[in-house]
Amino acid sequence: MNKFKVNISGMTCTGCEKHVESALEKIGAKNIESSYRRGEAVFELPDDIEVESAIKAIDEANYQAGEIEEVSSLENVALINEDNYDLLIIGSGAAAFSSAIKAIEYGAKVGMIERGTVGGTCVNIGCVPSKTLLRAGEIIHLSKDNPFIGLQTSAGEVDLASLITQKDKLVSELRNQKYMDLIDEYNFDLIKGEAKFVDASTVEVNGAKLSAKRFLIATGASPSLPQISGLEKMDYLTSTTLLELKKIPKRLTVIGSGYIGMELGQLFHHLGSEITLMQRSERLLKEYDPEISESVEKALIEQGINLVKGATFERVEQSGEIKRVYVTVNGSREVIESDQLLVATGRKPNTDSLNLSAAGVETGKNNEILINDFGQTSNEKIYAAGDVTLGPQFVYVAAYEGGIITDNAIGGLNKKIDLSVVPAVTFTNPTVATVGLTEEQAKEKGYDVKTSVLPLDAVPRAIVNRETTGVFKLVADAETLKVLGVHIVSENAGDVIYAASLAVKFGLTVEDLTETLAPYLTMAEGLKLAALTFDKDIWKLSCCAG
C-alpha cells in the first residue's frame, strides 16, 4: 500500500467529504480520511492501482483534484514547531483527544503523536464497528426467529461484504467528525510517526527530537495471545481481523468468552455461523454474580451457541483451511474443528516501542504503565491514561481520565481519578450491564449484605416483548439499605444502567428507588420492581402497585 494526500477544491460540507470518499472507494482506495475544512483527502492505494485513477475519480465526482503527493513517514516533521510543548500526547484515541481539547481550553500548546490511524481503538476497530454489526446481527436474528404468532418473517442470505463496506463508511465518518475535524477546530499539532523516549523530557519522532513540560501516554492496548502450542503457526483471527471478513464462516471457534468473545461469537451466530465458545474457567463471566452468569449462559444455549467450559488447551493445528483445537474437559479429550478461529483472550498495553526506561517510567507485570491517583507515572512529568494502564477498558473511562489528567498537568489542580463507580455493558443479546459491587465484593469490604434477585419474567416490558431470559439483581447494605451494586441481564440493559449508576454514585437507598415513579412497560421499571422485591412479593402486586 502507498499513502497519498491530495488537495481538493469544491468541498464545502461533510456531504462533500462522503462523495469524495465514495469516489475513491470505487477505485479501491483504503483508509480514506477527507476534510472539507482542510480541502484535502488522505488515502492508501494498493501497488497495482495508479494514482492518476484517484485524480480522475475525484474530478468525475465534480470536485477539483489539485496537487497530490505521496505521504512519507516524515510528513509532519516540517510542521513541528521547535519550541517546547506544554503538553505532548502520545496516542490519538479518546483519552488523547479529551486531554488535548481541555489543554487547549487552558491555553496550552499541544502536540499529538500518532503512528497509525487517528481515533484509537473505539472508533476504528472496537466499539463502533462491532456495535453497528451487532445491530445488523440482531435484526437478522429476529427475522429468522421472532416470538410472535402470526408474523411470518424470514431472512435472506447475508451479504457480509456489503455489511463490512457500510461499517467502514460509518467508521470513516465518525473518525472524521469526532477526531480529525477537531484537530483544526482546536488548532493543535498532529505529528504522524512513532514516538520513543530518549530521556525524561524528550521523545524522538521520525528523527526529530521533541520536548515538553508534560507528557500524556495514551497508546491503548491490542489483542494478546495465550500460550497455546501451535498457535503461532495458525491463521487465526483477532477482534480486528474478524470484522474485516468478507465471507461468513460455516463454523467459528472462539477461544475466550469474555465480553469480546461473547459479543463477536454471538454476532457471527446471528449471521449464520455455527459457534463454539471455549474458556478455561468453569463459569461464564466468573467475575460477575452467579445469577448474571447463569442468565447469560442460559440465553446463549437457548440460541444454539455451543459452550465449552473448564477447558485445558493442549494444542491447536491447521490442516488446509480447517482449524482444530485440542482440549481436555472433565478428564476427556475433545477436538473442536472449524473453518475460522478467533482468539479473544484479553488485551495487552501498547508500551513496547516507547523506551519507557529512558524516561524513568515504571511498568507492571503485564507491561502496563503504573500510575497514581492523579494519573502520574513514576516520572512526575509523565502521565498515562486509558487502556495502556490496564484499568477499566472502556472508552468513557479513557476520556474521563484524559480530562482529569489535563486538569492536573496543565491546570495545576490535584484531582484524583475516581473509578469507584464505573458502569460496564456487554452488548450481547440479552445485554449484560453492571455497576458497583457484586455481592461477594460487598462482603469482602465488610458490608452486611442484603440482595434482591428479580427474574426477567417478572418485568412487564420483557413479558410483552416475549423475551424473558434474564435477571435484575440489587446489592444493598443491610443496615442502611443503600444501593451498592446493580446487575442486569435484559434487552436494553445498557440503557437502564445509567440510572443505576446514579443510584450507586449518590448513595440512594432501596426506598429511594421504590418511592420514585417508574414508567410502565419500560425495562427501567425493572429497577423499581427489584427494589420492591426486598420486602414484598411482586407476584402479588397489581401493575405499577408498590
From Swiss-Prot:
GO terms for molecular function: flavin adenine dinucleotide binding; mercury (II) reductase (NADP+) activity; mercury ion binding; NAD(P)H dehydrogenase (quinone) activity; NADP binding; oxidoreductase activity, acting on a sulfur group of donors, NAD(P) as acceptor. Keywords: Disulfide bond, FAD, Flavoprotein, Mercuric resistance, Mercury, Metal-binding, NAD, NADP, Nucleotide-binding, Oxidoreductase, Redox-active center. Disulfide bonds join C122-C127. Residues 2-66 form the HMA domain. FAD binds at A96, G116, T121, K131, A195, D387, V395. One of its GO terms (biological process) is detoxification of mercury ion. Belongs to the class-I pyridine nucleotide-disulfide oxidoreductase family. This is Mercuric reductase. Optimum pH is 7-7.5. The active site is a redox-active disulfide bond. Hg(2+) binds at C543, C544. Presents to be a promising candidate for Hg(2+) bioremediation due to higher catalytic efficiency, temperature stability and salt tolerance as compared to MerA enzymes from other mesophiles. Its EC number is 1.16.1.1. PROSITE patterns: HMA_2, PYRIDINE_REDOX_1. Resistance to Hg(2+) in bacteria appears to be governed by a specialized system which includes mercuric reductase. MerA protein is responsible for volatilizing mercury as Hg(0). Catalyzes reduction of Hg(2+) to elemental Hg, which is volatile and can diffuse out of cells passively. Plays a pivotal role in mercury resistance and cell protection. Gene3D superfamilies: 3.30.390.30, 3.30.70.100, FAD/NAD(P)-binding domain. InterPro entries: FAD/NAD-bd_sf (IPR036188), FAD/NAD-binding_dom (IPR023753), FAD/NAD-linked_Rdtase_dimer_sf (IPR016156), HMA_dom (IPR006121), HMA_dom_sf (IPR036163), Mercury_reductase_MerA (IPR021179), Pyr_nuc-diS_OxRdtase (IPR001100), Pyr_nucl-diS_OxRdtase_dimer (IPR004099). It catalyses: Hg + NADP(+) + H(+) = Hg(2+) + NADPH. The keyword Cytoplasm does not apply. The gene is merA. Homodimer. Uses NADPH as the preferred electron donor, but shows slight activity with NADH as well. Inhibited by Cu(2+), Cd(2+), Zn(2+) and Co(2+), with Cu(2+) showing the strongest inhibition. Enzyme activity is enhanced by b-mercaptoethanol and NaCl up to concentrations of 500 uM and 100 mM respectively, followed by inhibition at higher concentrations. NAD(+) binds at G256, S257, G258, Y259, I260, G261, M262, E263, G346.
